[in-house]
Amino acid sequence: MIWQKPFPDNRITGHYGTLSDYRRKMKMQPHSGTDWAMKAGTPIPAIARGTVVGIFESKILGHVLVQRVQDKNKKIWFIGYCHLHKKPTLKEGDRVGAGETIGLVGNSGSASTGAHLHATLSKTIKGVFGPTSVKFDLYKAIEENK
């Protein structure tokens, strides 16, 4: 079960668990995912092999695709790919290999920092939309599952 970063580290603009001045001023929770800034319309490679288990639209996260994956210890996780450019063409039940296109980078929802992929990691589908307290550091998990 090899996991991979969707984009280079130098494209990261938001780290899991950070509390920027803006987030503090707006009385927001710490950042709940990892953000990679990319040009709108850039294909997003799947972080890991898995199955599409949800396609959602959220006022905050915009177009979202949720993928069920396993780590190297065979534990089940859910990766949320958020702020997609448009509704993904993939459907629930589709199998996606690591590196295959999962959607396109966008700024749907309340993506206030421009086009980027906001990716989250949770133990449940609903957790993808929850606060930091029900999420995990996706970047760290990728490093541990290379």
Q: In which residue ranges do the predicted regions lie?
A:
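Surface-exposed, glycine-biased beta-strand/turn segments
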Residues: 1-63, 72, 98, 111
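Acidic, glycine-rich catalytic/binding loops that coordinate metals and/or anionic ligands
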Residues: 1-8, 37, 76-77, 91-100, ...
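Conserved beta-strand positions that form and line the central face of beta-propeller blades
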Residues: 35, 66, 80-83, 104, ...
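Sec/Tat-exported extracytoplasmic proteins
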Residues: 40, 56, 88, 105-109, ...
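Zn2+-dependent peptidoglycan hydrolase active-site motif and core
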Residues: 47-88, 114-116, 120
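Extended aliphatic helical segments
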Residues: 52-53, 64-69, 96, 105, ...
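Beta-rich strand-turn-strand
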Residues: 65, 88-114
